[in-house]
A protein has these predicted regions:
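Glycine-rich, low-complexity intrinsically disordered segments
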Residues: 1-153
Length: 153
């Protein structure tokens, strides 16, 4: 016999903020999905016809954030830190990797979920597209690599 439970309330995806170490709160219009994949390692043992399966390497997909371009340079400056570090000039703070939280909120601003991305750093920055015939705002995006994510709340 089916049991009737409490109705579920699904989380809306339109309200979220991003908190980045040393950058503060940032408003973005879009955030790509978070995903993790565990490789499936198969091997055959002792002539068995059925493979043994076990978890392999874990990979976390990069996340892309998009927002309207403003005079704020924080994301570009962060990328510049990474560029200087990777060029071997040694002119930057070794702590270019930062933690960031993606905070999903309800309509009234109550935190529903908090995803923590650990040791993130920008791999790509796109300044946006310019068009004399367009009415839209310039949208900049940054793609971030990170070590792992976890659901905090």
């Amino acid at each position: 016999m089916a049991v009737i439970g409490n109705p579920r309330s699904f989380h809306k995806k339109f309200k979220f903020i991003v908190e980045i170490d040393d950058v503060g709160h940032a408003g973005f219009q879009k955030c790509s999905e978070l995903s993790v994949e565990v490789a499936n390692v198969q091997y055959f043992e002792g002539g068995s016809l059925i493979p043994n399966k076990s978890p392999g390497r874990v990979t976390f997909a990069d996340v892309t954030l998009e927002r309207g371009a403003t005079v704020d340079r924080d994301l570009f400056d962060w990328l510049q830190d990474v560029v200087v570090t990777s060029s071997g000039l040694g002119l930057t703070d070794p702590y270019y990797k930062r933690n960031l939280d993606i905070v999903q909120q309800d309509r009234d601003g109550t935190t529903l979920r908090r995803w923590c991305l650990s040791r993130a750093w920008p791999t790509k920055f796109v300044a946006g597209e310019w068009d004399n015939e367009a009415d839209e705002n310039v949208i900049e995006s940054v793609t971030l690599a990170y070590d792992f994510f976890e659901l905090i709340q």
